[in-house]
Amino acid sequence: MTSLNGRHAEKTIDMPKPSAPKVHVQRSVSRDTIAIHFSASGEEEEEEEEEFRGYLEEGLDDQSIVTGLEAKEDLYLESQGGHDPAGPVSTAPADGLSVSESPAILPVSENTVKLLESPAPALQVLSPVPLALSPGSSSSGPLASSPSVSSLSEQKTSSSSPLSSPSKSPVLSSSASSSALSSAKPFMSLVKSLSTEVEPKESPHPPRHRHLMKTLVKSLSTDTSRQESDTVSYKPPDSKLNLHLFKQFTQPRNTGGDSKTAPSSPLTSPSDTRSFFKVPEMEAKIEDTKRRLSEVIYEPFQLLSKIIGEESGSHRPKALSASASELSSLSGLNGHLESNNYSIKEEEGDSEGEGYGSDSNTSRSDHLKPTEDASKEVEPKGSQASSLKDLGLKTSSLVLEKCSLSALVSKEDEEFCELYTEDFELETEGEGRLDKTLDLPLKPEVLASDGVALESEDEEDSATEHQELPVKTLGFFIMCVYAYLILPLPYYMSGLFLGVGLGFMTAVCMIWFFTPPSAHKHHKSLKALRHQSTRSLDIKEPEILKGWMNEIYNYDPETYHATLTHSVFVRLEGGTLRLSKPNKNISRRASYNETKPEVTYISQKIYDLSDSKIYLVPKSLARKRIWNKKYPICIELGRQDDFMSKAQSDKEATEEKPPPEKELPSEDLKKPPQPQEGTKSSQRDPILYLFGRTGREKEEWFRRFILASRLKSELRKPAGVSGSKSGLLPAHSRHSSPSGHLSHSRSSSKGSVEEMMSQPKQKELVGSVRQKMLLDYSVYMGRCVPQDNRSPHRSPVQSAESSPTASKKLPEAPPSEEEEQEAWVNALLGRIFWDFLGEKYWSDVVSKKIQMKLSKIKLPYFMNELTLTELDMGVAVPKILQAFKPYVDHQGLWIDLEMSYNGSFLMTLETKMNLTKLGKEPLVEALKVGEIGKEGCRPRAYCLADSDEESSSAGSSEEDDPPEPTAGDKQPLPGAEGYVGGHRTSKIMRFVDKITKSKYFQKATETEFIKKKIEEVSNTPLLLTVEVQECRGTLAVNIPPPPTDRIWYGFRKPPYVELKARPKLGEREVTLVHVTEWIEKKLEQELQKVFVMPNMDDVYIPIMHSAMDPRSTSCLLKEPPVETSDQL
């Protein structure tokens, strides 16, 4: 504790005031609170102090200055020298601040008060402070001058007594309770000086208001440190508040009532019972303190209510920091905080924040009553509310466990500026924001999935079955029985109770014996089943299905060939089919990872599929060929008169504009007009023939065409003919384009407003029709498929450039999956296929299947047919390394299996080159091939349609794409290439034919030497031994939605295959590396064409029913327009 005499203060009045770091320790007007002011510059504060002194000049009496520092504060003031505004620079060397465990008792004069500190529970280590420090750290330098005088010249009356030992460092007590310092300026100025750099940026405030805000916050910061020693809640009575207070309390108080200093922070020390004033005087001073407290806190509460009204709509993303709430809590005004944890850190919703919110409410309720007596007029604080910011965004993690002064000094100016401008509104909003922060982690738990919710319901049902015994009821009955046996009841009463009890027990026994014991359980199971049945898979089919297909104008099985088709981009939206023709054809076969075609569209046709007939051609297709991509889907369009006539009226104006496809930006270029094509199509295209690029894609298109053809008839039943309401036009505009009219004005066959308004109804109700068909299927599959893997990202991704099954995302494998989980499947398959690998019967069956495939491979006409001479199916079957969880989407059930094969499958193929056929007519040889196949002159495609014979392989020359003609080239006439499906030989074979038909070659073959050599070569067999040593990849198994009888399988990406090809020429083995590598590469390409997605192979299952199955009672056969059973 330091005290300064008046002479020393008088001596220092005339000293200059340089700008230097300084500390002011100042007493308030009410003599209840001190404030410590630390300033690094000391310039801006002086002007403000002079302004503030003008407000304090009224009603000030002679007051003594008792200057001191809080005992519990860690005073780490690091200024290197400076002057007090009212005192000279200290010159005595500072040895550091000594720590005293005993109360610091210093000599005092008549106008000086003693301050006794209670013994410290723990020593607070203080860092040494240089002597060059401003007052408070030096013995000779004055600490502060009193602001209670009217001017600097009047400071003689508020004298400062010197220290008891001027030559020594000040002795600071390390007590846990804070000292009652007798200056109103110091601590008030501390925060103010730290915030002055930020304040000039904001709108200026009245001096009184600014002093009030700063003083309140700084006093709060000081008061919170007092509770360090109060580890338990302790609230001393008013009679005990006379401890450690000053005699100056007895001086007359100001009558102006404009004290804007901080409220009282009375010091209490339970361990010290000594008093330095009389009780009556203390009681009078307590009343004065209460009055001033009510005056001080009334205006902040009014400001708080105003801020809440203005800032109610503001957004604060972060919760309060703990220290901000504690410092802003009005409980600090009375000095009764019950918490000793003070820290400034970011709130993460921990338990620390819950306590301070409750403390704030408790202490605030205690101080609401004195505010009712306040009569201060509240000044407008609109400018204050406009400068508020979010405190949580910049609150640092500085720990202020003991509210050390060093921590306050090290804080940024901006942080304290925000603190004192937001302390009042944060007080009431902090608790609410904290609760919101704590509730955030609980929200995901509420949003549970359907499967989890149902499981919780089942758990609740099972819990009800195992309820606790009705203890109260049983106790009541036991008491009744006990009373019946003990109490002396009359005989008639006893007989009545006995009869009632026996009747009740008889009824219970009757119910027990004659009621089935499982009735209740059955009821529970039905309830659980009903809950489970309502859980269906969220299968969402895309509203728009688009992809590439092949179209032919007229289909005749006898003359059809793949080269007669042309590519079209198909877009199916509701019941509208849009066909866009590119300027050049793309590949007729979809392949893995194919590039996006760069095409422009030259024409477009739009059809309405309502009431159309969808079926497959040719008639009587064999079951195994239903989804063969070589056979088209036939769409016999319904009545298109109104539809096409409306399109024709708009065709001339929109012929050259492309379809609205986002994927193809180049479609706006090079669109030559073809005005006569639309007219011909309206008369010539009542039937469309479309080929799928893969078998799986063909089945998908067929199913969607069926749904589209029945869409309008389904809509007419519930909705009538109300599809052309004008109110539906905006909805359609959102689906198609910003302007519904522009979206269709670009098309070449459709542009009428009536048709645009009729389509939205189809779009809105298309989901209901699909849901009607898939309802039971979805519920059934919902019980079979794990619910946690039905997310949309697992679904196959539709590719507009290739097909709906062009590219699919592989589900990620859970890391916990291990091979042991599939061990039972591998063991079962291995045991079942034991006989398959070892018995000759099954080897012959497989050989026959392979031979049928080989017989359909198109070879040059001078080579004989491929034959299988050797087959070794190895010693193992494919093994499932990992099975991914199944999932269901709009294309059906998907199961992904990680497969591996190491069985050394081996087969040997043989053929011969018949060079004697060179130079002869290929057509004659083709006819001979027809005789060998016992097909006569019937085209191969027509003969195979209704037979179980294998069709040509995927790599046959029939499917090879010859050089595509441009848009202006004429398509070849049907049948121009002969009976063999219009097959055209390759360039190499045509070149060979030219050579063999030349006169020179014919003359050379007539010589005996060459004839002999040709016969030797023709009789030499060509052998090719192929061994599959290893195959590993992810196999996707797909079962489409019902009705279907197919299981489709294919690899997600090209598998790793290790092939060994060993060609032989007679008895010689060809060892040329280039030859063997070329053969192996061709075999891998052949495998990729058949088994790599989007190409998938299929297996039909007899127990499943397809749409063309006469046994089927599926919804696709109920509609009369779809006469697939009659056609097939």
UniProtKB/Swiss-Prot annotation:
<feature type="modified residue" description="Phosphoserine">
    <location>
        <position position="265"/>
    </location>
</feature>
<feature type="modified residue" description="Phosphoserine">
    <location>
        <position position="733"/>
    </location>
</feature>
<feature type="modified residue" description="Phosphoserine">
    <location>
        <position position="745"/>
    </location>
</feature>
<keyword id="KW-0446">Lipid-binding</keyword>
<feature type="compositionally biased region" description="Polar residues">
    <location>
        <begin position="796"/>
        <end position="806"/>
    </location>
</feature>
<keyword id="KW-0472">Membrane</keyword>
<feature type="compositionally biased region" description="Polar residues">
    <location>
        <begin position="248"/>
        <end position="274"/>
    </location>
</feature>
<dbReference type="InterPro" id="IPR031468">
    <property type="entry name" value="SMP_LBD"/>
</dbReference>
<feature type="transmembrane region" description="Helical">
    <location>
        <begin position="495"/>
        <end position="515"/>
    </location>
</feature>
<feature type="modified residue" description="Phosphoserine">
    <location>
        <position position="749"/>
    </location>
</feature>
<dbReference type="GO" id="GO:0006869">
    <property type="term" value="P:lipid transport"/>
</dbReference>
<feature type="modified residue" description="Phosphoserine">
    <location>
        <position position="195"/>
    </location>
</feature>
<feature type="modified residue" description="Phosphoserine">
    <location>
        <position position="294"/>
    </location>
</feature>
<keyword id="KW-0813">Transport</keyword>
<feature type="transmembrane region" description="Helical">
    <location>
        <begin position="473"/>
        <end position="493"/>
    </location>
</feature>
<feature type="compositionally biased region" description="Acidic residues">
    <location>
        <begin position="946"/>
        <end position="963"/>
    </location>
</feature>
<feature type="modified residue" description="Phosphoserine">
    <location>
        <position position="264"/>
    </location>
</feature>
<feature type="modified residue" description="Phosphoserine">
    <location>
        <position position="752"/>
    </location>
</feature>
<feature type="region of interest" description="Disordered">
    <location>
        <begin position="945"/>
        <end position="981"/>
    </location>
</feature>
<feature type="region of interest" description="Disordered">
    <location>
        <begin position="645"/>
        <end position="688"/>
    </location>
</feature>
<feature type="modified residue" description="Phosphoserine">
    <location>
        <position position="799"/>
    </location>
</feature>
<feature type="modified residue" description="Phosphoserine">
    <location>
        <position position="269"/>
    </location>
</feature>
<feature type="region of interest" description="Disordered">
    <location>
        <begin position="787"/>
        <end position="821"/>
    </location>
</feature>
<dbReference type="GO" id="GO:0031965">
    <property type="term" value="C:nuclear membrane"/>
</dbReference>
<feature type="compositionally biased region" description="Basic and acidic residues">
    <location>
        <begin position="364"/>
        <end position="380"/>
    </location>
</feature>
<dbReference type="GO" id="GO:0005789">
    <property type="term" value="C:endoplasmic reticulum membrane"/>
</dbReference>
<comment type="function">
    <text>During endoplasmic reticulum (ER) stress or when cellular ceramide levels increase, may induce contacts between the ER and medial-Golgi complex to facilitate non-vesicular transport of ceramides from the ER to the Golgi complex where they are converted to complex sphingolipids, preventing toxic ceramide accumulation.</text>
</comment>
<keyword id="KW-0812">Transmembrane</keyword>
<protein>
    <recommendedName>
        <fullName>Testis-expressed protein 2</fullName>
    </recommendedName>
</protein>
<keyword id="KW-1133">Transmembrane helix</keyword>
<keyword id="KW-0325">Glycoprotein</keyword>
<feature type="glycosylation site" description="N-linked (GlcNAc...) asparagine">
    <location>
        <position position="593"/>
    </location>
</feature>
<feature type="region of interest" description="Disordered">
    <location>
        <begin position="345"/>
        <end position="387"/>
    </location>
</feature>
<feature type="region of interest" description="Disordered">
    <location>
        <begin position="130"/>
        <end position="279"/>
    </location>
</feature>
<feature type="compositionally biased region" description="Low complexity">
    <location>
        <begin position="736"/>
        <end position="751"/>
    </location>
</feature>
<feature type="modified residue" description="Phosphothreonine">
    <location>
        <position position="261"/>
    </location>
</feature>
<keyword id="KW-0539">Nucleus</keyword>
<keyword id="KW-0445">Lipid transport</keyword>
<feature type="modified residue" description="Phosphoserine">
    <location>
        <position position="816"/>
    </location>
</feature>
<feature type="region of interest" description="Disordered">
    <location>
        <begin position="1"/>
        <end position="28"/>
    </location>
</feature>
<keyword id="KW-0256">Endoplasmic reticulum</keyword>
<feature type="compositionally biased region" description="Basic and acidic residues">
    <location>
        <begin position="645"/>
        <end position="671"/>
    </location>
</feature>
